[in-house]
């Protein structure tokens, strides 16, 4: 497992926006991770983190509190994929659509008048 100390939360959101890899997210926030799992589910984890952060209001929080909230959200997103696979979680639309119930096609309606 890789881990690093939490970076000083000057503006954690700005730092995360310029992060170039999933590993940087984990290092900036000080979240331990398994490199094997991250190699398989990196995009899924970051997408799920984004979904969770969409419900958060970090703009008016002090830097250390915003960093703590981001860390908690990343840990939660990572835990989702420790417990199950990206196929089970279906974060992306293409995976959701693959199992979406198909709407049955209705037979074409032909009025009796057209059968003359």
Swiss-Prot record:
Keywords, A to Z, come to: Nitrogen fixation
Outline what the protein does. May protect the nitrogenase Fe-Mo protein from oxidative damage.
What is this protein's record name? Answer: Nitrogenase-stabilizing/protective protein NifW
Q: Which family does it belong to?
A: Belongs to the NifW family.
Summarize subunit and interaction data from the UniProt record for this chain.
Homotrimer; associates with NifD.
Statement: the UniProt record of this protein carries the keyword RNA-binding: no
Q: Does the keyword Transcription regulation apply?
A: no
Q: Which domain of life is it from?
A: Bacteria
Q: Which InterPro entries match?
A: NifW
Instruction: Provide one Gene Ontology biological process annotation.
Output: nitrogen fixation
